[in-house]
């Protein structure tokens, strides 16, 4: 069993090379083949004459972008390496002008994500996340199902402060592990394995829904809203929360029960868990100075982010203000910032992929692809088209190891096709954005946020594929049947 509380690096491969000589050899061999495949695909697309409706620049940028995404999907390179090579290739071949290529590094949305990563460090450092976890267990933990709801509540509360579900998994995982151990779970106990699996899968699944609830709870969310602006949609913190509230909260109520029936843990009653949590809280004592500062800062951030549109306040500036307060009060130090090395990696690959995706749209490639897909779906009524696009968008995620890469590659295409077929742009945009979050549990590799839970030793790979598929299908049904009328009412 792993007990690490640190999330996996965003700049590394999702699948770590196995230890030992044979594992390393296998990894290098697989990587070498994948790199040749990636290069071959890039060259084939590059030298094939572009379709009549497309210019050479758009076609060659597509060759580079497709190869970049393929490299990540098949494990040729980590996402950082692939993105850097892709951007450099686009610039050096003259496909992207220098000023355009570097413009995304000053994009306010991307800067907001990076600052929010640094803000999230304070929640972990001061222990506020752990305290919230114990409080939720003391309130909800009298049964196994109650523990699952406690996980969902804690995750939903801390989610808006974490722009990375991967980083948030580093806070949530040790809490789930503590719950499991308090319930008598250990690798040696065969009579508690399904209980451990239930709690671990609850942690994985909760991350998918808390990320859908809040705009700032997953790094791809604000990127998606930025892309949606090209269709005249202005999605802010408050409007996202209103749109997500009804279907997402309903999922949070329903899914723990679905998981309980699906996994069938050996133990259903947990009478000692609340007492254990209260004892842990008592040992922690009162709120520390740093916890009070962090709590007050994040309350202020959430309020200002929620009112940013009406007050005319820049959301990125609000994030910088919060970071400044935490640095000025000593809650965070320059040493803490220096430890967040993955933030720089995230900044670079976000910006690189974003500008390539954005320029594909600007050069007409997304419109061209949308027209082709629309021809395939031609004749479908808007309702059927919306459902088809959503289901296909979700199913394709089996091929991706990054939610953000999936969104950057396909969100604009599917939204454009839907609009051409008469689907409401706000409706489809929100449905696709929410799906980008809840499809993260489709497979073990579907999100880097899964890795700590998958590595716990309590989740079998076969079970994960089955449970993940059922969770995702159930979410699709709820978001379609309940979310659609709600979005038609509130989304603009």
Predicted feature residues:
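Transmembrane helix-loop junctions in multi-pass membrane proteins
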Residues: 45-53, 94-100, 128, 304-313, ...
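Interfacial loop-to-helix junctions that mark the boundaries of transmembrane helices
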Residues: 24-31, 52-60, 72, 99-108, ...
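Juxtamembrane and boundary regions of transmembrane helices in multi-pass small-molecule transporters
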Residues: 2-48, 125-128, 165-168, 183-197, ...
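Flexible hinge motifs at transmembrane-helix junctions and intramembrane kinks/re-entrant loops
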Residues: 51-59, 66-84, 101, 257-264, ...
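Membrane-embedded alpha-helical segments and adjacent helix-loop junctions characteristic
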Residues: 23, 50, 67, 80-189, ...
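Lipid-exposed faces of alpha-helical membrane segments in multi-pass integral membrane proteins
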Residues: 37-44, 63-70, 85, 89, ...
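Structural signature of hydrophobic alpha-helical transmembrane segments
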Residues: 53-63, 106-118, 172, 313-323, ...
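Transmembrane alpha-helix interface/packing and boundary motifs in multi-pass membrane proteins
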Residues: 69-78, 154-164, 204-215, 307-310, ...
